[in-house]
Design a protein with these regions (language model features):
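N-terminal intrinsically disordered, cationic/polar leader segments
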Residues: 1-10, 17-18, 22-29, 36, ...
Length: 97
């Protein structure tokens, strides 16, 4: 899911830079849905505080994507990309342990 989210944000950024409003909105919508899937997969009973923190972070990312869509701001897409990369790096590190 993380890779899919990163791809959708990158595609939205390209669409934004080329003035393709329809594609931008479509890709941002898909990225928001992917992050929603990540939120839904959180197990708050087992994950405790970590799951709660991730839920808040994912909600923040969804909000920033919506703002990027409304404001046409590439910087907000870049912000979400960095956050997704950091979370992905953390999960990848756990898997390698």
């Amino acid at each position: 899911l993380m890779d899919g989210g990163l791809q959708r944000v990158a595609q939205a950024k390209g669409a934004m830079q080329h003035g393709n409003v329809a594609l931008k909105g479509e890709q941002i919508g898909k990225a928001i849905a992917i992050i929603g899937g990540l939120r839904e997969s959180l197990n708050h009973k087992q994950g405790g505080e970590v799951a709660g923190n991730l839920d808040s972070l994912y909600a923040f990312m969804q909000q920033r994507l919506s703002q990027a869509n409304l404001r046409n701001e590439v910087a907000l897409l870049d912000e979400v990309t960095e956050l997704l990369r950091e979370v992905k790096s953390g999960w990848d590190g756990i898997r390698q342990s």
